Structures are given as C-alpha cells and as structure tokens.
Regions:
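Mature, structured domains enriched in cysteine- and short glycine motifs
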Residues: 185-238
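Non-globular, low-confidence helical/coil segments that flank catalytic cores
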Residues: 1-192
Length: 238
C-alpha cells in the first residue's frame, strides 16, 4: 500500500481506528481528498474527485465519488452518495460514463432517474449481500436502470465482479440480471407506526427518512441512539 485516500470524515468506531492504524503500520501516505482534484496513480489514468465532504452530518454524504477515465472509457464510483449529492454533481461535472457502481448498494436514496439519464451507463454494478435486511436493491433503482436501458450486474448473484478494458471496449466476468420493473417500495404503516417492508435498522438518517421522513421516537423498533445526536429521545428528526 502506497497511498490511502480518505474523505477526512472523523469516526469514533473501532473499525475506523483500526483502519488508520493499519495505514500507519503499512507506511502508506494518508491523503485527504478534495473536490475537483486529480489523483495521480498512473499516467494513463485520469481519476477526478467529483465529491467529498469531511464536514458532512451524515457519513454517507462524506463519500468520495470518483470518475475514472482510461482512454475512451469512463467509470463512475459513487460510494454512498445520495440523490442530493447526485444533483450537485450534475450541475458541476460531466458524469457520462460507460460503467457506474450504483450508489449505496442499490438503495433508493441514490441512483435517481435524472442522474442515471445523465450518466448514460451501459452497465450498472450493484454491490449488495444476498438476503440483506435493507431490501437492497430497491425496486425504484431497478426501475431506473431498466428505464435507461443499462445492463445490471449483481454481486449477490455473481460474487466478485471484474471489469476488464483496453480503454475502448470492456468485458465483465458476470452475466447481467433482469432488473425487472416493479412497484415502488411500499410505505404504508401498521398500528405500531412501522412501515411495511421497511428495514428495522438503518445505517444512517438519509435511509431512515425515506421511510420515516420525521424520524422515529425512542419507542419505535427502528430507534437507534447513534441517530439521536441531541439525546432528546427522537432519532433523525429534521
């Protein structure tokens, strides 16, 4: 390892501390990315940072978004950037790319139709676990992929996915799967205030607000102290 590129967003978890310790142990160069900069990796590659935010309130909004260009081929790596960040990037950059790694594991917090239409991808790679508790990839995202006419590839179905390119064409070591158009994720609530088909646990407030726009109280099954930053018994309120 020679370089470690980070968003600069500080975490307090053991995992984050362990990562920083590993970087130090390996003697790698720690580098905090900045919006618009070009990362130097190889003279034949152009890697531009389209988004990063060390001061983001939501960890996902701190995501580093990269556009990797090799000759005539472009690949967009979006991290967990949500639809608001997608809109910001559309106003500043040409995001058109042959390949995109769908944001946030195929969550409906990312991969808006407007964004995918601007990207004009030939292939969309969805990275998510089989039978995950979040319901990824969400039906809205599958609909959007189908609408723009891209082929979808799934790590849950194919495992590790490798893209090989000479800079003009590319091959993928997996078979595309049908991102069938389906009904939008249901958001009706039962008597306990729990949205049907919603995950019980959410990794961040952006995801939670897709189902619970006003957040949840401490009595709700989806309440988590880490989302209640002001300790008022209500998580992810606006």
């Amino acid at each position: 390892m020679y370089n470690f590129i980070d968003s600069g967003k500080v975490h307090t978890t053991d995992t984050y501390v362990n990562v920083l310790n590993a970087v130090k142990k390996e003697g790698a160069n720690y580098h905090q990315a900045t919006i618009g900069e070009l990362l130097s990796v190889d003279s034949s590659l152009k890697i531009q940072v389209l988004h990063v935010d060390a001061n983001a309130d939501d960890n996902n909004d701190a995501s580093i978004v990269l556009k990797v260009s090799y000759r005539d081929m472009d690949t967009l790596l979006t991290g967990d950037a949500d639809t608001n960040i997608e809109s910001q990037m559309l106003q500043k950059y040409n995001v058109e790319s042959e390949i995109i790694k769908a944001g946030h594991h195929g969550s409906n917090t990312s991969s808006s139709l407007a964004f995918l239409r601007a990207v004009k991808p030939e292939a969309v790679i969805l990275s998510y676990g089989k039978g995950n508790s979040y319901g990824h990839p969400h039906s809205e995202v599958k609909n959007n992929i189908k609408t723009v006419g891209a082929k979808a590839y799934s790590t849950a179905k194919s495992g590790n996915i490798v893209v090989t390119s000479d800079g003009y064409t590319f091959t993928i070591n997996a078979k595309p799967f049908e991102a069938n158009a389906t009904s939008p994720t249901q958001t009706s609530k039962n008597q306990s205030g729990v949205v049907s088909r919603a995950p019980i646990k959410f990794s961040n407030c952006t995801e939670m607000r897709k189902y619970y726009p006003n957040g949840v109280s401490s009595s709700h099954p989806s309440y988590d102290e880490k989302h209640d930053r002001d300790n008022d018994g209500w998580a992810c309120e606006k």
